[in-house]
């Protein structure tokens, strides 16, 4: 039996998962990651804490089932995207805390870029909109605001990377400075059409090219783990950003296949194949995980408040004691009783892009109970995801492709049967929950397995993917359209409020 080790470095925790060659979870270890908030709107992580925690979980996962490093055929890495690290090449020490993807300190730089008319250029090259979310302006902030850093960078003494690059550097003892296309595509510095760092964009942001890691396919050889770290050298064979890794772990290998990850927010990606497809509906174009030098793309949209609305019911309204109670409370009523909740607590993301929107609850009557509000809260997750998916389908049809035939789902909230059934009802297509829900880590393991010869092709991986449950739509298309029209009316009210 071949085993694969996936390092899954996320925003709130570092995890290591061992899979067997059938894609089953053999061992899992997790360590929480402290969050650092120096100022309002700023979010940081300690890169050394990330490294120490990730290494500790790898050791713990192996030890928990009596495996040794020589039992592992290959390692895959998946990571929180956009989070930015800058470190000294000689010492391997970071020059500053990592600036996390949620951090908004670079908004003024983004505003300047928009005012200077650079949005069309950046979108054409990167597939992204100008936003502080992405790594490029975070890196510029470090160069401009940390004493002595720009001079060191211009002397070639520093290295930049997203979290995957940082872990690869540490795992290989500083012998490999690399990233994969999916992570590179989230920096706002990478030309997704040419698969190269873009000299014009680097110059625009004043970033020395010497900082940048080598870009490889997602399934490739990234060096070997130093033997003294885990007891034996392990080849690093797969790397992908978390959402692209989840798309791969859901076996969405062909154009037109899509997955939605239901977490604190929701992340929806649809594979679009080898064609760069610019969205006309407020979505981002991003690189999908690549198993060869052939470029692969995906459309991506994010819902800012997904499962977080359940946390708000618990912590803000004190409507429930624990998040697990929400499904039973929502099921105690047949529907939301006309109540519609739009949880625009931090504005609305794709496809609306309305940062000024604020949350609303409409349709309240004397007969409204907390159960109706709980149901409306759950349904809001499905409405937002449906709006995203309908936008993706419009883009697909405009490009001559077929509309989406099914949606594969993962993430914590995908275990909620009521939510998944309502999602299928709104979309009018099957919603499929996989047997293995650790799809992000599984994607990294599969990428490593391909490059190390455990698997021969993505067709072989497709045969390993298994559904746990399929939710079929029960509403007529007319009724689903009525509900979506009511949702869109409620969304318009969030901007008027």
UniProtKB/Swiss-Prot annotation:
Pathway: Polyol metabolism; glycerol degradation via glycerol kinase pathway; sn-glycerol 3-phosphate from glycerol: step 1/1. One of its GO terms (cellular component) is cytosol. PROSITE patterns: FGGY_KINASES_1, FGGY_KINASES_2. GO terms for biological process: glycerol catabolic process; glycerol metabolic process; glycerol-3-phosphate metabolic process. SUPFAM superfamilies: Actin-like ATPase domain. Belongs to the FGGY kinase family. Key enzyme in the regulation of glycerol uptake and metabolism. Catalyzes the phosphorylation of glycerol to yield sn-glycerol 3-phosphate. Sn-glycerol 3-phosphate binds at residues 11, 81-82, 133, 242. The lineage of its organism: Bacteria, Pseudomonadati, Pseudomonadota, Betaproteobacteria, Burkholderiales. It comes from Polaromonas naphthalenivorans (strain CJ2). It is an enzyme of class 2 (transferase). HAMAP family: Glycerol_kin. Glycerol binds at residues 81-82, 133, 242-243. This is Glycerol kinase. Keywords: ATP-binding, Glycerol metabolism, Kinase, Nucleotide-binding, Transferase.
